[in-house]
Swiss-Prot record:
Keywords: Amino-acid biosynthesis, Arginine biosynthesis, Cytoplasm, DNA-binding, Repressor, Transcription, Transcription regulation
NCBIfam families membership: argR_whole, PRK05066.1
Pathway the protein acts in: Amino-acid biosynthesis; L-arginine biosynthesis [regulation]
PANTHER family in the record: ARGININE REPRESSOR
Role played: Regulates arginine biosynthesis genes.
Residue ranges the record marks as coiled coil: none
Location (main, coarse): cytoplasm
Cellular component GO terms held in the UniProt record: cytoplasm
Molecular function in Gene Ontology: arginine binding; DNA binding; DNA-binding transcription factor activity
Pfam families the record matches: Arg_repressor, Arg_repressor_C
Gene: argR
Name this polypeptide is given: Arginine repressor
Keyword Ubl conjugation carried by entry: no
Taxonomic source organism: Pasteurella multocida (strain Pm70)
Length: 155
């Protein structure tokens, strides 16, 4: 699929979810097919729902429907970092960073690029959680301070 078609599909997908009238993935598939996206199937819709952090919620008619909450939108290159980091916590051995859904790998990659010079041995990232392991000589309080400064947050 070329980029223009993919962008058109993603835009149509987002517009459909904004209507808050689709209660099942098969309804979304059917609507996209009616818009001319004939190669769409349930598994592709499922992946897009996951990618964009879609949730099922009740609409104004009290029907369970899929929607894309604004506060859970997928990060992009224009997202300010401080908006992606929700919480930073730690114990004596590891720092745990909670992010918006889909942002953990982006933030972890940034932390990995900073590297050992600032006390970061490595990171492990899921969808919305990052484990940061400090180097042996790193003071955990100093590491927390530098991470918070990086994300301009006082969490």
């Amino acid at each position: 699929m070329n980029y223009e078609k993919q962008d058109n599909l993603l835009n149509a997908f987002k517009e459909l979810l904004a209507q808050e009238r689709f209660g099942s993935q098969s309804e979304i598939v059917q609507a996209l097919q009616e818009l001319g996206f004939t190669q769409i199937n349930q598994s592709k819709v499922s992946r897009m729902l996951t990618k964009f952090g879609a949730v099922r919620t009740r609409n104004t008619r009290m029907e369970m429907v899929y929607c894309l909450p604004n506060e859970l939108s997928v990060p992009n290159t224009k997202s300010p970092l401080k908006n992606l980091v929700l919480d930073i916590d730690h114990n004596h051995f590891v720092v745990v960073i909670r992010t918006t859904p889909g942002a953990a790998q982006l933030i972890a990659r940034l932390l990995d690029s900073i590297g050992k010079a600032d006390g970061i041995l490595g990171t492990i990232a899921g969808d919305d959680t990052i484990f940061v392991t400090p180097t042996l000589d790193a003071n955990i309080a100093d590491l927390i301070k530098s991470i918070r400064n990086l994300f301009e947050t006082s969490i």
